[in-house]
Amino acid sequence: RKVCDCYIAFSNLNNHPLHRIMGEGAFWRIPDKPLITTVFFDVDGTLADSQGKVPESYANALRYMAQSVSLYLATSLSMEQAKKKLGKALFDLFRGGVFADGGLLSYSRQIKCLPVKVYPEVYGESSKVTIHSYEGVVYKYSILVRDKEQRESILTRLKENPCQVFHKAPLITVIHPEASKKEGVLQLCKALGLASEHTLVVGNSLKDWPMMSVVSHSCAVMNAEPLLKERARYTLNPDRLAAFFRFSNGDPIDQTSSDNS
């Protein structure tokens, strides 16, 4: 159930920038800004576009928000992949986050991994395997298999083992069976004492909904999957968040942002 948290005002303004967000018509809404102290962002499709680039308007918004709110990532990417995609300057604005779909958590100068067992006997020597680890602990690995029959055989055998398997041809990704963005966000909120009513999670895919559903403020980006936009409390792009939320003053950035692979 959606809750109205704004004032309704009458306006005869034409071509106002808010019409792009609120829609055309005589009635438009002036929001009563909720207080937000922490924001979690997905990366692919949320901060980064289809070409893997972060729009400059989003980058500027992140720099602005980082001055007064705690920023965290919540992504299927490993930590080094997220750093490469965002670039060091933007990545360093974040205090940590949930990486590899919950396989690795980074916060308060700590890094915690959910180890996943590697099964070389399943995928063989002919497959291209990328292993992501921290201090020798493997928390995610990906297998590139272009042959469909071979890929299906590997998938079948992997699913017989205690691991979580994601498949988007030609790539197979393996993480700990209990890892998830939702559990990662919950663990960070508990460890850091983050209040749900002051936490915002921003995503673009229906797969992001479980982690978005555990906080009071969920936001889908404008080009998100329709089903996610139906469920999310807000539909806004990252560069519009400051117009609709009141951000608290945060402490200086304190994070661990390096990853061993």
Please state what every model-predicted region is.
Residues S50-Y134:
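Active-site phosphate-binding/coordination module
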Residues I36, S68-V69, F94, D101, ...:
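Short, well-ordered alpha-helix to beta-strand connector turns
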Residues F10, R29-L35, K182-S261:
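Mg2+-dependent phosphoryl-transfer enzymes with acidic/Ser/Thr/Gly-rich catalytic loops
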Residues R1-V43, Y64, L194:
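Non-catalytic pre-domain segments flanking phosphatase-related domains
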Residues V39-F41, V98, V201:
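Residue-level marker for buried hydrophobic side chains located in beta-strands
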Residues P120-V214, N223, K229:
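Conserved acidic, metal-coordinating active-site core of Asp-based
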Residues S57, Q81-K84, S106, S153, ...:
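Phosphate- and divalent-cation-binding pockets in alpha/beta enzyme and binding domains
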Residues L47-D49, D208:
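Catalytic P-loop NTPase motifs of RecA-like helicase/translocase cores
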